[in-house]
Amino acid sequence: DCFLKDYGADGCCNEGAQYYRHAGLTLWGCLDILSNVAQDTFSPLFHEPKIKHIAEYICNVHVEGPYYLNFGDCSPLAGRCGAREYRFGQTVGSDALQALAAADFRADADPDHLQNPDGSTHINLWYRLTTAFAEEEMMAYSAAPRHHLTVWYPSAGVYAARQGSWVLGAKFGSNGDSHNHNDTGSITVYKYGKPFLIDIGVESYTKKTFSPQRYEIWTMQSAWHNLPTFDGVQQLPGAEYAAREVCT
């Protein structure tokens, strides 16, 4: 309950795709372990719509190949999906998540599946065992990944749309998110699965990143996103600085 209270009913991770693996996906890990110990108590939680929405978030912000729609501190290269995402999809009954995870796993050129920007992925013994036990299933899973044409997450103001070769991502919401940038209204665009209008994400974390001087860093400022600056005035941080009258 303490974890889930920070999510809206739509399951959006307001920190972005890169942080999904440290948030929703680790929720699955905890519940999976607990349900193996006390099945009657914890297994029913996987039937909760909110948890399924949390699981499928990563599918809905996936563009193509290695790219994800990104905002805030999130990188567009959020890392490959694999066994944990596959099992999460299996547990909540999401064919879309299973298909994405299996396809991503099969596309990995590294036979040991160790090349991931998240270092914990290959040093965590449980993650490695999960991969070993799921590998045969993922290699044989034949369904192709699929995406919704439009997705709207009102809890965080995240929007995604697809038409032909184009993919659009938009960040509405407010400037009060976790790992926030002053990026309300910013957009990213992909064409044929490649970046067209980008969000540069964040530099390497330093002491300043999580200090009162955070918004002195240029990557945090609205002028360095796909946004207008009026008479030299940029956006300010805080939940009160938010999008209004959003139409999707």
Provide a role label for each language-model segment.
Residues D1-Q18, A134-A144:
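Active-site lining segments of carbohydrate-active enzymes
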Residues D1-C13, P117-G119, E240-T248:
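Contiguous N-terminal and early-domain "leader" segments and peripheral loops that mark the onset or edge
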Residues G8, E64-P66, A223:
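Residue-level signal for pocket-adjacent positions within structured domains
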Residues G8-N14, A38-S43, G176-D177, K207, ...:
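Short helix/strand-bridging catalytic loops that position acidic/His residues to coordinate divalent metals
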Residues A9, E15, F71-D73, F230:
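Generic structural "secondary-structure junction" signal
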Residues N182-T248:
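Active-site rim segments in enzyme catalytic domains, especially the processed small/beta chain
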Residues H22-F196:
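Carbohydrate-active enzyme catalytic cores, enriched for enzymes
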